[in-house]
Amino acid sequence: MQNVNEAPTYIHQFDKDEQIISTQDLSVFYGGSVQKLFNASLQFKKKTITALIGGSGSGKSTFLRCLNRMNDKVARVDGEIWYHGLDINKNNINVYQLRKNIGMVFQKPNPFPKSIRENITYALKANGENDKQKLDQIVEESLRAAALWDEVKDKLDKSALAMSGGQQQRLCIARALALKPEILLLDEPASALDPVSTSKLEDTLKQLRTDYTMIMVTHNMQQASRISDYTAFFHLGHVLEYDTTENIFTNPKGEITEDYIRGSFG
């Protein structure tokens, strides 16, 4: 296989007015000197789904967590992350506000041990919203957006822990949407779900694309090809190729990308 340090990179570029968030020479170090991400420069288009693919340890989840500063306490992050004209990798950024605008859904569903309703309203109340009518409206809007309202509208005061795994994951999406983010980061959101729940989740994400920008880590290449508009391929901490999903899967430009897509390694 071609040496990753000698491999050419093929990175799609967007016009400035198409971008919602971008990175420039983003590098991540653990323990002070162990580098896990090398000079990643990517631009993300508004209201699209981008899949981040690559083998285990390729750097895709490390990259994703940089976008809303989830790596702050565990790693050193060098480089720039541009969002609305601000480099959000700077120390003067309000990280709490940033995470309202750039929400995250994790690999394993993590509902609060509270009612379905309280899962949605908890953060809203913490931000000072106490108007019951407004809270009820946001609960319904968020659950509808996550394609969950019809399944739970008569169970809002029941424990979220009694829901199925697929429902819990969609609840976590609804919980993030309640804060009105522009961007939703998803770290292998379907990896713990059965095929039926995965299909429902994918349908939900495709519907959300009209209003939100989504960036999703996945090991499932079939999933990436089904629902994403763009795909970035990570290998050993390097972004080697970034293009439309159709091009990545049918006409990859890089030798290592082609080997990965064909299943020569994982």
From Swiss-Prot:
The UniProt record lists the ABC transporter domain at 21-261
Q: What is its main location?
A: membrane
User: Where does it localize?
Assistant: Cell membrane
Output the Gene Ontology terms for molecular function. Answer: ATP binding; ATP hydrolysis activity; ATPase-coupled phosphate ion transmembrane transporter activity
Q: Does the keyword Plastid apply?
A: no
Q: State if Nucleotide-binding is listed as a keyword.
A: yes
What reaction is this protein's catalytic activity?
A: phosphate(out) + ATP + H2O = ADP + 2 phosphate(in) + H(+)
Q: What is its EC number?
A: 7.3.2.1
Alphabetical keyword list: ATP-binding, Cell membrane, Membrane, Nucleotide-binding, Phosphate transport, Translocase, Transport
- Biological process terms in GO annotation: phosphate ion transmembrane transport
Residue stretches in coiled coil: none
One cellular-component annotation, GO: plasma membrane
Q: Where does ATP bind?
A: G54, G55, S56, G57, S58, G59, K60, S61
InterPro entries registered for this protein in UniProt? AAA+_ATPase, ABC_transporter-like_ATP-bd, ABC_transporter-like_CS, P-loop_NTPase, PstB-like
Q: How does it sit in the membrane?
A: Peripheral membrane protein
Its family remark reads: Belongs to the ABC transporter superfamily. Phosphate importer (TC 3.A.1.7) family.
NCBIfam families recorded = 3a0107s01c2
Q: Which PANTHER family match?
A: ABC TRANSPORTER I FAMILY MEMBER 17, PHOSPHATE IMPORT ATP-BINDING PROTEIN PSTB 2
Q: Quaternary state and partners of this protein?
A: The complex is composed of two ATP-binding proteins (PstB), two transmembrane proteins (PstC and PstA) and a solute-binding protein (PstS).
Purpose: Part of the ABC transporter complex PstSACB involved in phosphate import. Responsible for energy coupling to the transport system.
Name the UniProt record assigns to this protein: Phosphate import ATP-binding protein PstB 1
Which species does the entry assign this protein to?
A: Lactobacillus johnsonii (strain CNCM I-12250 / La1 / NCC 533)
